[in-house]
Structure formats: C-alpha cells, structure tokens
C-alpha cells in the first residue's frame, strides 16, 4: 500500500533521528504533516484522478513514521524498566479504542454532513434553475430516456456530490483537529531516556 512506502523507509532511521531531535519536535512535525495530508484530501472531487487519490496516501507515510516512534518515546519516558511492558500495552489499547471511537464519530459526522449538503443541493433543483433544467435535458438526450429516468440520473449525481462534499468537510475537520492538539504535545516532558524507552518497547 502507498501508505507504507515512506513509513518503511523512515522507520529504521527514527532511532538515530531521535538521538538528535527532541521527540516533541518530531511529533509536532508529524501532526503538521497529517494536517497537510487532510487538506490535500479536502480538495477531492467526484472526478478525481488516480494520481490525486494516491498522492496524499503516499505522503501520509512520512508523518506516520515521525509520529508513532516519538509518541511511544514520550509515553514511556521516565518509567522504570519493569513498568514499560504494561505501559506499552495500555497505550496500544487506548490507541485502538480511540481509533474505534473516532471512526464511529467521523462516520456519523460524514452522514450528517452528506444529508445537509443533499438538502442544500436539492433546494437548487427546480424548474427555475437553468443549470438544473439543462442537466435534465442533456440526460434525456444522451440516454434517450424520459423525464423521470433523467431525473433519477441527475439525482444519483446529486447524491454523489453531497457525499463528496460531506467527506471533504470531515477532511477539513480532521486537519483542524491535528493543528489544535499540537499544544498537548508540549505539555509532556519526556526525559533524556525517551528514545531508549521507545526502543525497549519495540516488541510490545
């Protein structure tokens, strides 16, 4: 998968990088990177080409590599060796649980925004809107169908546009969330043994 290309390349280097760069700086760069990726995705349209679709996923591998190892280092920093396995296990549980909750919330948000955009678009679908009437006429001419079938065809396109606009809203929201939570990184105070702690938890 494109997401793993840069992540696989950068992951082995992270230990050396963390010896020279503070983990909080790396995590901050990762969050900025995630936000940038979501901004790119917020530009999607229903006519998106394959390159535009793959590029953000490919680039996401960079902040992914910059994020997970420093995050582990921050979490495990300052803990005695006998506490590291438990802390690593707990952090993994919280990550999976938060991911599940976040996925559910975003899916609900996407559905709500799709309904909103569908409502806004259908408000414009009337006989007084020249673009709408032209679309119906073009569908009838191209498909050689009656008005009701042409209307159904236009409705399908409207549904797709509403879903795309709703998804773009979620991407914008995701980018904003990553920017807003950056200060939380700097509330932490990782110790000098942060990189070693992350390496020690690699198998967990």
Across the structure, where does each feature detected by a protein language model lie?
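Transmembrane core module of solute transporters
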Residues: 1-86, 193-204
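Hydrophobic transmembrane architecture of multi-pass small-molecule transporters
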Residues: 91-190, 195, 199-204
